């Protein structure tokens, strides 16, 4: 997959930084509508030190955060939203179907389905090798910093 935004370009769009920037690159992008990002899950991730030391599994809340960051890229790279922040305002219908472990390539896809003023909703899914790991509906609140 071709890179649309690399790691440094992502940091110009969303305010997240290490160790909490959870997407490595964007491979598909439609302004304000859709974004697909990739996270290479490494055994060196800090969360694996405690989740779990002898059985490394990426925490589900971090998978949903990675999805939220992917959605934030879709929303914040538009001219009207540059310099703003997208807050994670809600999550519905979240389901985890598969564990995500070191060595996995996590594909994160978010489609924005509704915008009403500064509030947006989207459908999201995370997959590994085409297998569904997580699906949910996200709510975003865009605001000035």
Curated annotation (Swiss-Prot):
One of its GO terms (biological process) is fatty acid biosynthetic process. The active site is at residue 51. It comes from the Bacteria. Gene3D superfamilies: Hotdog Thioesterase (3.10.129.10). It catalyses: a (3R)-hydroxyacyl-[ACP] = a (2E)-enoyl-[ACP] + H2O. One of its GO terms (molecular function) is (3R)-hydroxyacyl-[acyl-carrier-protein] dehydratase activity. Its EC number is 4.2.1.59. One of its GO terms (cellular component) is cytoplasm. It is found in: Cytoplasm. It is an enzyme of class 4 (lyase). NCBIfam families: fabZ (TIGR01750), PRK00006.1 (NF000582). HAMAP family: FabZ. This is 3-hydroxyacyl-[acyl-carrier-protein] dehydratase FabZ.
């Amino acid at each position: 997959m071709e890179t649309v935004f690399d790691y440094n370009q992502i940091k110009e769009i969303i305010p997240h930084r290490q160790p909490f920037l959870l997407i490595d690159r964007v491979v598909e992008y439609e302004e304000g509508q859709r974004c697909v990002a990739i996270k290479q899950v490494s055994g060196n991730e800090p969360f694996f030190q405690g989740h779990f030391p002898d059985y490394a599994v990426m925490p589900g809340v971090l998978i949903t955060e990675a999805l939220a960051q992917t959605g934030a890229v879709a929303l914040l790279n538009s001219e009207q939203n540059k310099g703003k922040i997208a807050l994670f305002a809600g999550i519905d219908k979240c389901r985890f179907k598969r564990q995500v472990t070191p060595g996995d390539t996590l594909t994160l896809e978010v489609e924005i389905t509704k915008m009403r003023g500064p509030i947006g909703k989207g459908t999201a899914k995370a997959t590994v090798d085409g297998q569904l790991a997580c699906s949910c509906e996200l709510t975003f609140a865009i605001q000035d910093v």
